Amino acid sequence: VIIPNYNYARFLRQRIESVLAQTYTDYEIILLDDASTDDSTSILKHYSANPHVSHLEINSVNTGSPFAQWQKGISLSRGKYIWIAESDDAAEPSFLKKAVSVLKQYPDASFCFLGSHCIDGEGNQLTTDFDRWTSKQLSRSHNMGVFDGEDYIKHNLYWRNYIYNASGVVFRKQCFEQIKDLSCFSMRYSGDWLFWIEMAKQGMVVEVYEKLNNFRLHNVSTTKKGQKTGDGVREDIYIVNRIEHSLVNIGRQRKTVRHGSFYKEIKRLKVPTEIKEELTLHLASSLKANSSDYYVERFNKSFSWLMPWLITRDKDRL
């Protein structure tokens, strides 16, 4: 269990206690701090005496990337399965037991992803729902969906990072070790999205339709900062380009609609016009996209109920 932290002293105790309260007890805890300036280190040092804690690593200089801490924690880990338990989140006591049992049941699965309740800074449950499960997902037997990894990329991760919170995932370390390109760890905003794409290439993906994770929402996040500057969109374009080069069977209509969704996103960004123009040019050069893709995306979204063969992001989801 890797707990990477940066300036979340106010949530650390709840995070660590929610790990110690797990009904599955065969685990080690790796505590990481990325040069916090609050009271984090004293809290981490207090918990370092717990027999479950195998490592406490405190950086003297901030890395500038949350994903660099992921890589560090994974390199220190000794277990078969890895849970990156973000320091501001929490979990239900049955989370690990459920996740590990699923990975044992499906030995070809590279990771399993469980649902989340969204909570605020005080721990109150919010109505926000990032899972967005429909009858398609909830009608599956045993509250689970089991997918071929490449199909999961094509129909799900090509459109967006459905794996919206690392704290909701347990993955197989052996599958991580098969990844050859770890450029995701040097990214600032969307490295987690690329990470799950690379993990999905290593085996099957299992979704568990139970909300056993608690995902804390903040007013300011790294992702939102990236959207404000446009840098997050640049990283997203890079990721979609990677997918299109690695999967040959995406299909022309799916590509067109996906490119159109980028045009829509850029149009709606609250950034200066010159940044929008720069992003539009970058989109065209990177993905060979053009403005007509935007109108195809809008048409498909408006009329897919009438013409079921039209592809949209939501309809394409497995």
Where are these regions (language model features)?
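A conserved acidic beta->alpha catalytic loop
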Residues: S18, T25, D33-S42, V61-T63, ...
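Glycine-rich, basic loop-to-helix element that forms the pyrophosphate-binding segment
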Residues: N59-S77, A90, K98
